[in-house]
From Swiss-Prot:
This is Farnesol dehydrogenase. Pfam families: adh_short (PF00106). NAD(+) binds at residues 11-40, 64, 164. Gene3D superfamilies: NAD(P)-binding Rossmann-like Domain. It comes from Aedes aegypti (Yellowfever mosquito). GO terms for biological process: juvenile hormone biosynthetic process. Highly expressed level in the midgut and brain in adult females, and at lower level in the abdominal and thoracic ganglia. High levels are detected in corpora allata (CA), Malpighian tubules and fat body. It catalyses: (2E,6E)-farnesol + NADP(+) = (2E,6E)-farnesal + NADPH + H(+). It is an enzyme of class 1 (oxidoreductase). InterPro entries: NAD(P)-bd_dom_sf (IPR036291), Sc_DH/Rdtase_CS (IPR020904), SDR_fam (IPR002347). Disulfide bonds: none annotated.
Length: 245
């Protein structure tokens, strides 16, 4: 992680769970971290978990990644304040409690796609343009899911697996576009199994399933960022021991 000391990381969905763990660990590792979230006060509260030397490196910014105008304003702010972004972690993701074949739920399903897919794409576009403009060999990390590779039968998953399958395809498309452009920017998909987070249905927790913790995924992010410039971890799958899915 030495090469990233003092560099700028943008983390979406930074207010809780995986995003909060990643935000905290990147700041501890010496990066300047811009944590994006709708609940910005919860990102600000993460400073309590940081050593005094790291607290000034964490910047909490209100942003709803389902809104393109929010994304545009945030990346303009990052460019003005810090010069640009070196690492992007697309972590923001939502799951709505409904069925795919339900009724009067079109808005709920669109919210999932707008956040999990379009938010990821639009943030990646802004980060890439920032890296390209400054000739930075940066890194874009997508927090994907095992359901982005295989659809499992669990209640009210609705359009969530489709949104994560999109992330898998988007990762490969980005890799191809970066290669064709002669870019040294890396792109990585990290696909966790079941993680104990706020969006995890209570039925999974109460069912006694094996669970990962948010910190396990954050450690994976640190690992992929710490690889040599010649190494790209394209896909990393992480499951808890004994997972049924």
């Amino acid at each position: 992680m030495d090469r990233w000391a003092g560099k700028v990381a943008v983390v979406t969905g930074a207010s809780s769970g995986i995003g909060a763990a990643i935000t905290t660990d990147l700041a501890k590792a010496g990066m300047v971290v811009v944590g994006l979230a709708r609940r910005v006060e919860r990102v600000e509260a993460l400073k309590a978990n940081l050593p005094e030397s790291a607290k000034p490196r964490l910047h909490a910014v209100k942003c709803d990644v389902s809104k393109e105008e929010d994304i545009t304003q945030v990346f303009k702010w990052v460019e003005k304040k810090f010069g640009g972004v070196d690492v992007l972690v697309n972590n923001a993701g939502i799951l709505r409690q409904t069925d795919l074949l339900g009724t009067d739920n079109g808005q709920m399903l669109r919210e999932v796609l707008d956040t999990n897919v379009m938010g990821l794409v639009l943030c990646s576009q802004k980060a890439y343009q920032s890296m390209k403009k400054r000739s930075v060999d940066g890194h874009i990390v997508h927090i994907n899911s095992v359901v982005g590779h295989k659809v499992f039968d669990f209640p009210q998953s609705n359009i969530y697996p489709a949104s994560k399958h999109a992330v898998t395809a988007i990762t490969e498309t980005m890799r191809n576009e970066l290669r064709n452009a002669g870019s040294r920017i890396k792109v990585t998909s990290i696909s966790p199994g079941v993680v104990r987070t706020e969006i995890l249905p209570e039925s999974i927790i109460e069912g006694g399933h094996a669970l990962l913790e948010s910190e396990d995924i954050s450690e994976a992010v640190l690992y992929v960022l710490g690889t040599p410039p010649r190494v790209q971890v394209h896909e990393l799958t992480i499951k808890p021991v004994g997972e049924k899915f």
